[in-house]
């Protein structure tokens, strides 16, 4: 699919609006078409996707997909964007039983099974944990103004900032201990985090949606939005959100 849209000339034209209200680019639409064709082979599953919303099925399974997480990176050719797929037995975060994130840039494949651990390219994660004293904080943001406003609040909280452009991948990197905390300055949807949150939780790392229901009760839909904080412990998450809220 990406080979058919090799540059931003082909990838960035806006072809519509997603159900969530964001513009749908050509690369978003092409990726979603491919993944939905595959997922619709799962008999009876309800599919929840950023672009088309909810496609109701008759079965118990719910598949939550973000065909391109990191759309701006994808359309500009920056190799840090991902496919994110979560499979759930119900309608909330606690019901997610499987998560899969594919990094289109590196080719890394991240997977998690509820109560079965998390893996990177088949190798178990969890040995390298994020540091409680935050050396690297991954910000996820869209506007320069929001970064400028909140970065000052991180002085004394985090040593270095990274803004990489894919919330799902940033959470995967947290699960692997590559970064020490993740904060989204823009409110995220369930499709952005449904798969990656399972990797984080299976590694015993804290994650919260401070502006939503209790994390496990957060609905797997395209309507709800909240900022996301994730770090080594609940206490670190609370301190981060308090600093961001000043």
What are these model-derived regions, one by one?
Residues 1-68, 241-246:
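N-terminal subdomain of lithium-sensitive/metallo-dependent phosphomonoesterases centered on the IMPase/IPPase/PAP
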Residues 1-10, 152-155, 172-246:
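Oxyanion/phosphate-interacting regions
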Residues 82, 86-172, 223-246:
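Acidic beta-strand-loop-alpha-helix segment within the catalytic core
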Residues 62-95:
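Glycine-rich active-site/cofactor-binding loop and its immediate structural neighborhood
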Residues 46-50, 65, 74, 120, ...:
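General beta-strand structural signal in soluble alpha/beta enzymes
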Residues 28, 39, 71, 112, ...:
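Residue-level signal for inorganic ion chemistry
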Residues 46, 98, 180-181:
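Short, Asp-centered acidic motifs that coordinate Mg2+ and/or phosphate
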